Amino acid sequence: TIIGGPDMIGQGWRMLVECLSIGRCITLPSGATGTARYALGWSGGFTRVRRQFNVPVAEMEGVQEPLARMAALAYISQATVYQTANMIDHGEKPAVPSAILKSQLTEFQRVLLSDAMDVHGGKAVTLGPRNYLGIGYSANPVAITVEGANIMTRNLMIFGQGAIRCHPYVLEELAAKDTNDMKAFDKAFFGHAGLIFGNAARAFTLGFGIGKSSVPFDGPATIYAQDIARLSAGFGLCADAAMASLGSALKKREMISARLGD
């Protein structure tokens, strides 16, 4: 039996990747977020109860630092899972966000579990029925490896796919090239060129502090949104330069692709 009938012969990889873009947005990121909140909850409670030098270890700055990091990573993880789940609810297939989430959140899980093990000390090292962290810590490499190992996702998929899927003109240029549609290609090409020059001008003016990006809201977060807009303009310029200079060889230059993905 062939899924989709005879017309889908040879389309198995495409169907698998399309399903993966949805499933990978839900399973591993949600699992990593659950693990993060679980480890953070136990760590917060344990460090209040555990006392050293007659004070709770939660009051020691050396313990507060990893606890704060754990809280931040757990908050970021939960927020991103809500965002991508909302995208799926609206019928989208977030292939690139799913790759980002899978890679980043399982790496967050690695850091968070290491911090949890550190603040628990010997209690988390000895396996047994009262060790509520050891199994999760030992299972973390599974999440990092399955559904696209993080080393592959980071080096090939995030920017390798994102540079094409998320670009307003590259897909149109490739489609026009395949169909030999010169009119469509010229339209996409000159639009792409205009985007590059516009990005360059925006990146340099914002980089030198000339003008500020408009943001759709007011309040304390405005300055951070403007900083993100400035950095995004610089990133867009770097991405365009990498794509223009390396072309199809960009996927083979995995360290560059990985850094742009980061």
Which residue stretches match the model-derived regions?
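Flavin-dependent oxidoreductase catalytic core characteristic
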Residues: T1-D262
